[in-house]
Amino acid sequence: MRTMKGFYVLFTLHLCFLDSGKTGKILVWPSDSSHWINLKVILDQLQRHGHEITILVPSPNHLFDLTKIPFNVENLQLPVTKETLKEELDTILYIASFEMPKLSWWDRRAKLREMGKRFFRVAKRICDSAITNKELLSRLQAAKFDICLADPLSFCGELLAELLNIPFIYSFRFSHGSVIERLCAQLPTPSSYVPGSTSGLTDSMTFVQRLENWLLYIMSDIMFLYFLFPEWDEYYSKILGKPTTLCEIMGKAEMWLIRTYWDFEFPYPYLPNFEFVGGLHCKPAKPLPKELEEFVQSSGKDGIVVFTLGSMIKNLTEEKSNIIASALAQIPQKVLWKYTGKKPDTLGPNTRLYEWIPQNDLLGHPKTRAFITHCGTNGIYEAIYHGIPML
């Protein structure tokens, strides 16, 4: 009898502390290209745990394949063609890849402003397609979402969350000069030992380098606060019907999911709502398609080199392509090169071109010896995960 009584007491206590699981509705305002690849990993897990995902996808776009998106999709029709969007993106990439490296420090600031204007022009069109669509807004309000997951480099997710009166979370890597982190998220960044993003500096700086870092912060602040953000401040104030700023709304983010990990960063202060999630997309390699596997095996003991410049860089000049191909032809390894464009005249017999490659599966192959990369976050962590040297 005493045993049964004890059981009931324990069972009652268990019920007191038992919390029933609850799934929610999540609205997603994503960015295109590699940002989407990383975000989708998070969304897949959320959906696997029973949460309902609705994603807003601009049309046309760069990388979204609607046939492979297993979530609810709301299409945002843009008043531009895919060709126009591609031309705008190619121009931005051309400036960054071929014009910027040749410019002086001061001239690069002017080019960055030009690139920012072009990028924000595209972002504004995407934002308009959602915010001015009253029918869409009504559907979203009726859906009663619990939270919005957005990318701060693709403005408007935070504005949409504000209109729907729901909290929002950011998935983020970095911004130029760490502007968004410093000014909007209020992240402490002493210029004496915290190198600004894209500065190329480390946390161990000489006096001159500290001065350079400080100037980067100042110039970035001026460029964004006085030349790029004001248009968005005015836009957000108009939509919300009250004076506000882009940074003020961004600062309301409940959490910032940083797509890197603390052991791969220089040490500097972080806030409690910054969470490192780098490498979430990493996974064991799957078997390669037959044609790829045969080419990889033909490399013998020398193995293979995987070469890719990511999902966006597709505008290498003919001259640069030939220089790279000529260099690759001189190494003993077989090379798998993710490449779009005219076949280089100097392409060696050891190199094959592919418009797409299973990057993670190749990096996890036992015959892979090195990874030539533009240092995109996804590729870096896949190479670390599989233990592959990077160039």
Task: Describe the residue ranges of each PLM region.
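Long, low-complexity segments enriched in small/aliphatic residues
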Residues: I249-F266
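Glycosyltransferase specificity loop/lid
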Residues: R2-K238, L257, F264, F276-K286, ...
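Conserved, non-catalytic sequence blocks in retroelement Pol enzymes and Pol-derived host proteins
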Residues: T244
